[in-house]
Regions:
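Terminal beta-strand-rich extracellular "head" domains
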Residues: 100-118
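Exposed extracellular interaction/assembly regions and N-terminal maturation sites
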Residues: 30-101, 120, 127-144
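Cysteine-rich, disulfide-stabilized extracellular repeat modules
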Residues: 5, 16-17, 25, 30
Length: 144
């Protein structure tokens, strides 16, 4: 494969082996990895106005204030997943989840956490349910 810098051919690279990946046909990929798109910050400003088009996970590594997690402003697809990870800064922080509206959260077999546990990481896993137009919270766990 020839490589150009925009004005001249500068080198060539060995093309990968195997079939090319198409954009519309169904293909099985082997030995490929899709890196999650993660938004990580020390403390998330409240409210969290998040967009499922941009990220697969949100992480707060030293949450310093109470946090409201708004409904998704993106255009999720059925069965899309999102993970939220919270660690406070040594003080328990209130968590409020938007419910009851389009692309908001719904508890399915779990209870959404309403506070962080001091110095412990909490994960919340959700799956988008297109029929219900909700992010179904299906997993919550806090570090022991």
């Amino acid at each position: 494969v020839a490589v150009s810098n925009g004005s001249a051919w500068i080198t060539s690279l060995t093309a990968p082996t195997g079939a090319l990946v198409g954009t519309t046909d169904t293909q099985t990929l082997t030995n490929k990895r899709i890196d999650p798109r993660v938004s990580s910050t020390a403390s998330i400003a409240s409210p969290l106005a998040w967009d499922s088009d941009d990220f697969d996970a949100y992480a707060a590594t030293a949450q310093a204030n109470a946090l409201t997690i708004n409904a998704d402003s993106g255009t999720p697809v059925n069965a899309q997943k999102i993970i939220f990870r919270f660690l406070d800064n040594g003080t328990a922080r209130a968590l409020t989840w938007t419910t009851g509206s389009s692309k908001s959260f719904r508890e399915v077999g779990v209870t959404l956490p309403t506070t962080t546990t001091v110095n412990k990481t909490t994960y919340v896993g959700c799956i988008y349910n297109a029929a219900a137009d909700r992010w179904d919270a299906v997993a919550t766990v806090t570090e022991a």
